Amino acid sequence: MASSMISSPAVTTVNRAGAGMVAPFTGLKSMAGFPTRKTNNDITSIASNGGRVQCMQVWPPIGKKKFETLSYLPDLDDAQLAKEVEYLLRKGWIPCLEFELEHGFVYREHNRSPXYYDGRYWTMWKLPMFGCTDASQVLKELQEAKTAYPNGFIRIIGFDNVRQVQCISFIAYKPPGF
């Protein structure tokens, strides 16, 4: 019987600190502990209306553009706008007016992914109203913006300077025909 001996240099390291550690599991686990029946994810099997599943219709997007918060409601009158502005002032947020002359809704011109490159940046009307405590001051600025840009969209935002986030945003004025 012929035998051959191959000699190769081998370097081994011994870690004395890990001598009490158990080697990781390297074999296959038994499948006996796992369920073998596949669940059915079809929602028609759990429908309680005799097997007929009806879905709700989404809002039709053609000819009914929606803008921001409260845009599904009728336009706000001056008293309702004042209440919204009082709310954001009570929360300690800083009111600010923004306007847009061309696109008052989300649009994608150069990018197809939803994010901040989809037409959400509007032009700021003056500076944020730091120190504002009265809703009539904001409504006065809104009137000035409406006279300056009668064919533009104007929105009021509330900015939280502690968390540095925009907390509320709603359309305060839409041009005629929208």
Curated annotation (Swiss-Prot):
Presence of keyword Transit peptide: yes
Stated name of the protein: Ribulose bisphosphate carboxylase small subunit, chloroplastic 1
Gene Ontology biological process terms in this record: photorespiration; reductive pentose-phosphate cycle
Chain segments annotated as coiled-coil in the UniProt record: none
Misc. remarks from the entry: The basic functional RuBisCO is composed of a large chain homodimer in a 'head-to-tail' conformation. In form I RuBisCO this homodimer is arranged in a barrel-like tetramer with the small subunits forming a tetrameric 'cap' on each end of the 'barrel'.
Family: Belongs to the RuBisCO small chain family.
Taxonomic lineage of the native organism: Eukaryota, Viridiplantae, Streptophyta, Embryophyta, Tracheophyta
Assembly description: Heterohexadecamer of 8 large and 8 small subunits.
CDD domains from the UniProt entry: RuBisCO_small
Subcellular locations according to the entry: Plastid, Chloroplast
GO cellular component assignments: chloroplast
Gene Ontology terms, MF aspect: ribulose-bisphosphate carboxylase activity
Transit peptide: 1-54
Known role: RuBisCO catalyzes two reactions: the carboxylation of D-ribulose 1,5-bisphosphate, the primary event in carbon dioxide fixation, as well as the oxidative fragmentation of the pentose substrate. Both reactions occur simultaneously and in competition at the same active site. Although the small subunit is not catalytic it is essential for maximal activity.
Plastid keyword on record: yes
